[in-house]
Amino acid sequence: LTFLFASAKIGAILVTVNTNYKQHELEYLVENADIHTLCISNGTFDSDYVDMTYTMLPELKTSQRGHLKSNKFPYMRNVVYIGQEKHRGMYNTAELLLLGNTITDEKLEVQKQKFNCYDVVNMQYTSGTTGFPKGVMLTHHNITNNGYCIGQCMKFTENDRV
């Protein structure tokens, strides 16, 4: 959730990835969505996301963090490992947080003023049962309004806690 709120605050678009994706599905999504920064964890069940990422981005093992140049994925620049382990070419969570100190409050405010509630904040991919998965773009307003409408349907009041 931290990455979701942080990306929303700076106007970045968070692309959610199905944790059951196999190698070819992840590669399709990264290429289709023009991913700039990929945030990964160890993996789930039988998926090793670190290994999948190195397979997808072999240049990562010899790249400086933040300076990835991939022939296959030209928009990809950064990989962040969610955790404290260090992996070649990737920022870990602590290093990412330190990068926040390089941006002044003034620059952050300028960035925040560049977008509004009708800008895309999240892209979710369909299951792809009838073809390749398609990215569905959701705005800040879409997500907020969805929560509001659900609250209305469930007859929530200001006294309720969710």
Regions from the language model: what does each represent?
Residues Y148-Q152:
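Generic structural signal for well-ordered alpha-helical scaffold segments
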Residues I10-L98:
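Structural core segment of the AMP-binding/adenylate-forming
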Residues Y118, N142, C153-V162:
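Conserved AMP-binding loop of ANL adenylate-forming enzymes
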Residues K112-F115, V121-N145:
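Conserved AMP-binding A3 loop
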